[in-house]
Amino acid sequence: QFAWKLRQDPRVVCMEKTNIRYVTPQDIDDVLDFASVDVSFISLTKVLGPARELLADGGEMVCLIKPQFEAGREKVGKKGVVRDKSVHEEVIDKVILFAISIGFSVLHLEYSPIKGPEGNIEYLVHLKKEQDVEQAGMKENVDVQKVVEAAHGELDK
């Protein structure tokens, strides 16, 4: 799934099929300035901590929030699709609050214009690693409800 153009770029380290929870800074040749995270069948809250350790202070990360892997099973519908806007808001809030609690600032939130394979609406959160947890927080007015409403308005057609 990794774009061929990116795969060929010498600045890019593709870590497909890698359990990021077990990667240490010693496993990577350099401290990362940027990382993108797209995980399946696991909550982002399980991987943000280990991924944070790989970033330089001030490093940034864009993560794909997939409601179907953040919500409890009782909130996931047929074919693994989460349609309820309130569940989308709940899981985004959960991921954002967790990210802040471990020392990330939230720079931006947007919905992905591409639905997941089964039709799930997914979201992109842009994070920045702060030197210490006290500096973490929202760096812009991220309105989760507004982003979810816009996503459903555009993609529920």
Predicted segment positions?
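Short alpha-helix
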Residues: 88-102
